[in-house]
Amino acid sequence: MQVLQGAEARAALTRTFSQIPVPDAVLSRIEQTFGERLTPEQVVERILLDVRARGDDALRDWTERLDGPRPAELEVPAAELEAAQVAPELHAAIRLAAERVRAFYRQQPAHGFLEHGPDGALGQLVRPLGRVGVYVPGGLAPLISTLMHTAVPAQVAGVPDIVVTTPPGKDGQVHPAILVAARELGLSRVFKVGGAQAIAALAYGTASVPAVDKIAGPGNLFVVIAKRLVYGQTGIESLPGPTETLVVADDSASPRYVAADLLAQAEHNGAEPVLVSVSRELLLAVQAELNEQLENLPEPNRSWARDSVGARMKVVLADSLDEALDLANLYAPEHLCLLTRDPWSLLGQVRRAGGVFVGEASMEALGDYVAGPSHVMPTGGTARFMSPVNVRDFQNIISVVGVNEETLRRIGPAAATLARAEGLEAHARAVESRLK
């Protein structure tokens, strides 16, 4: 285990904001699928253009080519949605998670204001978006939590129309847990479409899939590229990349808990776990725990986690907790876990993070599911300037200007002066026409 310190640690935790590396396996699959060497961007551009031109037919073709059987119908029938069942324990967990996420976001201030005073009326109107598309990744398992952690804030924001897209399984069907979660949230439109083709459908619309005002939800490299390319045609909430967790720990932390929290994220494909501690003894103890816990993980989780730990994990020895928090802010992690003797005393020093998990009872894995805040958080250092999914992501703010004539006469001449300074004579004359 290489332990970084000082300038070496700062250099390792400074983001370069380079493109996400493309694994050789992805490039090989692209060549097998398309019969030529293409970049992921070229693949996505081809899919977007095709869906925009051919609509539902293109969706069926790409789904058959990339995901499995050709879908006869793109939308999950209402009867299938109503009939979906899961084990009672899972259904109860879905219900609890939805309730807690909804309760959390109902506390977020999301109202406008309109002040009537001597100047007239000035204010802001807050209006929900008309239609939102929620993308739920498929892949190896149904990401039930992503649906709840994305759709519920949109519902609390007042969005009247929410549609869901998710890749079908190899049997051509949407996993029943996704359908149960959608039903629990009162969502009635779920489409069996994934990948870049789903993003294209939500952005441009097809005969079956309605175009939306904003697309929300994480996805693989192709989904992220597609969201970036359709931005402007529709809105996007973020461009989430591989997950990351930075743990700040002192000598009071349990090596078992620290290792468990690091591995909880390391089992995600491409994850980057980071440990910053003021105790060399803890670092050594965590290394031993990581080895033991890795061996006890089932496959394929063990291989995924071992890859993340071996290829991307960073271990830092800080001189003080102040330095540890400074390094955390430099890194701007998606998840920041504080496992120290007095974690609440450090909260005031946190300036850049998607989410902060305070104390050993508040493990990040809890936040992934039932704590309350959305787990869709900024990655890749974008927590410097972006926020987790929240109610404001699904609302418009409209400025209201309603000054009276007395105020116009007082401030209008200044407006005309500024307009002429900018070379905009018609602006100045529009103001002066009301002053005569």
Swiss-Prot record:
The pathway it acts in is:
Amino-acid biosynthesis; L-histidine biosynthesis; L-histidine from 5-phospho-alpha-D-ribose 1-diphosphate: step 9/9
Catalyzed reactions per annotation: L-histidinol + 2 NAD(+) + H2O = L-histidine + 2 NADH + 3 H(+)
> Could you tell me the keywords of this UniProt record?
Amino-acid biosynthesis, Histidine biosynthesis, Metal-binding, NAD, Oxidoreductase, Zinc
Question: What InterPro entries does the entry give?
Answer: Ald_DH/histidinol_DH, Histidinol_DH_CS, Histidinol_DH_monofunct, Hstdl_DH
Q: Where are the transmembrane segments?
A: none
Say if the entry is tagged with keyword NAD: yes
Q: What is its EC number?
A: 1.1.1.23
PROSITE patterns reported for this sequence: HISOL_DEHYDROGENASE
Annotated Zn(2+) binding lies at: 265, 268, 368, 427
SUPFAM superfamilies found in the cross-reference section: ALDH-like
Which biological process terms from the Gene Ontology are attached to this UniProt entry? L-histidine biosynthetic process
Q: Which GO terms describe its cellular component?
A: cytoplasm; cytosol
Q: Where does substrate bind?
A: 243, 265, 268, 335, 368, 422, 427
Q: What class of enzyme is it?
A: oxidoreductase
Q: Cofactors per UniProt? A: Zn(2+)
Q: What CDD domains does this protein map onto?
A: Histidinol_dh (cd06572)
Q: Which GO MF terms does the UniProt record name?
A: histidinol dehydrogenase activity; NAD binding; zinc ion binding
Task: Tell me, in a sentence or two, what this protein's role is.
Answer: Catalyzes the sequential NAD-dependent oxidations of L-histidinol to L-histidinaldehyde and then to L-histidine.
Q: Which family does it belong to?
A: Belongs to the histidinol dehydrogenase family.
Name-wise, this protein is: Histidinol dehydrogenase
The source organism is Deinococcus radiodurans (strain ATCC 13939 / DSM 20539 / JCM 16871 / CCUG 27074 / LMG 4051 / NBRC 15346 / NCIMB 9279 / VKM B-1422 / R1)
Species lineage:
Bacteria, Thermotogati, Deinococcota, Deinococci, Deinococcales
